Amino acid sequence: MTIAEEFATRNFSIYGQWTGVVCILLCFALGIANLFHVSLLIIFSALCLVSSFLIIFIEIPLLLRICPTSSTFDTFMRRFTTNYMRAAIYMGMAIVQWLSIIIDASSLIAAAVLLTIAAGFYALAGLKGQGFVGSKTLGGQGVAQMIL
């Protein structure tokens, strides 16, 4: 199934997963860019950077198979297999970035907006009763099992 065919299914979990991939790039870039502030904004930029690495393992299940991680980390990551749990973690990460406005308005707002959109897609998928469907392009639905 191509990416276009995946989007044509109108499953909001696919939209959420691909928005999550964009969040990986944006959180990584903005986390690094805002590390050079000489204020408490450094804390929020470090949390944004950590969020990008969490999202990598949440959205690309293939990495849990090929990267050496602890069983505790694997168990933690496997909690986020449902739409509601993914919506919850994305909303949690978004709230942290929205709180960065307290310190100073910065480009971290873009990360907060995109994380909120991803949480919204996953929440809509859950509310519509759509099961979580992982993108084949990102290692879902059988690709990760082919490595073993």
Curated annotation (Swiss-Prot):
- Give the function comment from the record: Golgi membrane protein involved in vesicular trafficking.
Would the keyword Transport turn up in this protein's UniProt record? Answer: no
Where, subcellularly, is it found? Golgi apparatus membrane
Q: Which UniProt keywords apply?
A: Glycoprotein, Golgi apparatus, Membrane, Transmembrane, Transmembrane helix
Q: Which residues cross the membrane?
A: 12-32, 38-58, 85-105, 107-127
What this protein is called in its record is: Golgi apparatus membrane protein tvp18
Q: How does it sit in the membrane?
A: Multi-pass membrane protein
In terms of domain of life, where is this protein from?
A: Eukaryota
GO terms under biological process: vesicle-mediated transport
Query: One cellular component GO annotation, for this chain's record?
Result: Golgi membrane
Species whose genome carries this gene:
Botryotinia fuckeliana (strain B05.10) (Noble rot fungus)
The Swiss-Prot or TrEMBL record describes its family as follows: Belongs to the TVP18 family.
Glycosylation: residue positions: N11
Matches recorded under SMART domains: Cg6151-P
